[in-house]
Amino acid sequence: MPKMKTKKSASKRFTARPGGTIKRGQAFKRHILTKKTTKNKRQLRGTEGVHETNLKSVRAMMPYA
């Protein structure tokens, strides 16, 4: 049986952590930043865990992560 391919778009967006969790970047910080407050932009800086409802589909896209 051939190897499963990793979806490259998913591997660029998500990172797998040793504990089994998958991290993702925050949305809403690419453009139209002038109307967003400094506090809002600062809070969007970090990474966040993928929600449990999306975890199964993200793991299917990254079989070796």
Swiss-Prot record:
Listed InterPro entries: Ribosomal_bL35 (IPR001706), Ribosomal_bL35-like (IPR021137), Ribosomal_bL35_CS (IPR018265), Ribosomal_bL35_sf (IPR037229)
Protein name in UniProt: Large ribosomal subunit protein bL35
GO biological process: translation
Family: Belongs to the bacterial ribosomal protein bL35 family.
NCBIfam families: rpmI_bact
Pfam families xref list: Ribosomal_L35p (PF01632)
Record's keyword terms, sorted: Ribonucleoprotein, Ribosomal protein
Biased composition (Basic residues): 1-15, 26-44
Annotated source species: Ralstonia nicotianae (strain ATCC BAA-1114 / GMI1000) (Ralstonia solanacearum)
SUPFAM superfamilies with a match to the protein in the record: L35p-like
UniProt entry tagged with the keyword Ribosomal protein: yes
Domain of life: Bacteria
Gene name tied to this protein: rpmI
Region of interest called Disordered, as start-end residue ranges on this chain: 1-65
Any one annotated GO CC term: cytosolic large ribosomal subunit
One GO MF term: structural constituent of ribosome
